[in-house]
Amino acid sequence: MSSFKFIPKKILLLGSGELGKELVVEAKRLGLEVIAIDKYENAPAMQLADNSFVIDMSDKEILKKKIKELNPDFVVPEIEALSIEALKELEDEGINIVPNARTVEITMNRDKIRDLASKELNIKTAKFSYVFNVDELEIKSSEIGFPLLIKPLMSSSGKGQSLVNRKEDLLLAWNDALKNSRGKIVGVILEEFLNFDYEFTLLTIRKTSGENIFCEPIGHEQYKGDYQCSWQPLDMNQSLINEARKMTTKILNNLNGSGIYGVEFFVRGKEVIFSELSPRPHDTGMVTLVSQNINEFELHLRAFLNLPIPNISLLKPSATRVIISDKESNTPSYSGLNEALELENTKVLIFGKPTAKKGRRMGVVLSTDDDLNIARENADKSALKIKIVS
């Protein structure tokens, strides 16, 4: 009989959105104490956490003071908008940052993760260039070629991303990128617009032993860089899956922190092209709440808590479709829920965000079926029935 005893830990969640909320659900199943932090009151994860605080996580001293005061066993970032300097200093003092402060820093900056993948590890990416001065914009753009994408060096959920087809639109895209940029860096990344066949997420669990475990690829679609729908399994050639796993292993061997990673790729013909990486549960991975025997949130916890991870298996073909607000509201409510839930094997998750904004993700539909096409159709139909009302 094993002498190992699991002792419940205190987890501090930095960022309390919908992904954090599901992480809290799984953490509470394991008897963990969870404290949630965000910049606004009543964020989704706060509604389930043992305690919560509203602070400016981008302020180094404020963040350091609060973390020291709470003295958690693990600090688990869920967002990019936080002081990396605070995390690095706290890690040096012995605080456990998940997966580690270096990884959080690299993945929150598009230039750092792109340089690591392309220049240091020689992993195939789209052509790219950095621009830190508006006077360089036209020259660098001509080197990449049109159409191209302009993105802030630091942002999330597709904010500030633009597809530019001609040089006359460069300045507008530049201004939009800077307006939606996080952090203090004034700069953008110009990226070749790939005419890809499809894109996917490879959820990868990095154990404390250094072993990598791969979930089945998740197909997804985005609009302006923001997730719209996802499905699992994805019908793709095994040789392409193997290539994506090889690339992922190279990156994670360099980053070397335990937890789950959402690694995004494009496929163009027989090419697999690295896109982005998040060191935490991924929005496209919400499909695993119904598609896998162990969902991505529980996998994240098991990985950094050094708990066993047995075989990960697919339960049934599954799909998601997000519920997007088309209006502003300080007291959002929802119509169409009855009709949405009439479809078989379909669930609706309302995130519980206290306010609605145009384009804001307010919920997600999860659907399963023996036929993946039917699962996707039902997720789409159900999501269309739900409307945000004031």
UniProtKB/Swiss-Prot annotation:
Presence of the UniProt keyword tRNA processing in the record: no
Family the UniProt entry places it in: Belongs to the PurK/PurT family.
Protein name: Formate-dependent phosphoribosylglycinamide formyltransferase
Subunit structure: Homodimer.
Domain ATP-grasp residue range list: 115-305
Binding-site residues, ATP: R110, K151, S156, S157, G158, K159, G160, Q161, E191, E192, F193, L194, E199
Keywords: ATP-binding, Ligase, Magnesium, Metal-binding, Nucleotide-binding, Purine biosynthesis
Function per UniProt: Involved in the de novo purine biosynthesis. Catalyzes the transfer of formate to 5-phospho-ribosyl-glycinamide (GAR), producing 5-phospho-ribosyl-N-formylglycinamide (FGAR). Formate is provided by PurU via hydrolysis of 10-formyl-tetrahydrofolate.
Keyword Ligase: yes
EC top class, as a word: ligase
Gene3D superfamilies per UniProt: 3.40.50.20, ATP-grasp fold, A domain, ATP-grasp fold, B domain
Gene behind this protein: purT
Molecular functions (GO terms): ATP binding; magnesium ion binding; phosphoribosylglycinamide formyltransferase 2 activity; phosphoribosylglycinamide formyltransferase activity
Reaction catalyzed: N(1)-(5-phospho-beta-D-ribosyl)glycinamide + formate + ATP = N(2)-formyl-N(1)-(5-phospho-beta-D-ribosyl)glycinamide + ADP + phosphate + H(+)
Residue sites binding Mg(2+) per the record: E264, E276
InterPro entries: ATP-grasp (IPR011761), ATP-grasp_carboxylate-amine (IPR003135), ATP_grasp_subdomain_1 (IPR013815), PreATP-grasp_dom_sf (IPR016185), PurT (IPR005862), PurT/PurK_preATP-grasp (IPR054350), PurT_C (IPR048740), Rudment_hybrid_motif (IPR011054)
The species this protein was found in: Prochlorococcus marinus subsp. pastoris (strain CCMP1986 / NIES-2087 / MED4)
Pathway note: Purine metabolism; IMP biosynthesis via de novo pathway; N(2)-formyl-N(1)-(5-phospho-D-ribosyl)glycinamide from N(1)-(5-phospho-D-ribosyl)glycinamide (formate route): step 1/1
EC number: 6.3.1.21
PANTHER family: FORMATE-DEPENDENT PHOSPHORIBOSYLGLYCINAMIDE FORMYLTRANSFERASE
GO cellular component: cytosol
Biological processes, Gene Ontology terms: 'de novo' IMP biosynthetic process
Residues that hold N(1)-(5-phospho-beta-D-ribosyl)glycinamide according to the record: E18, L19, E78, D283, K353, R360, R361
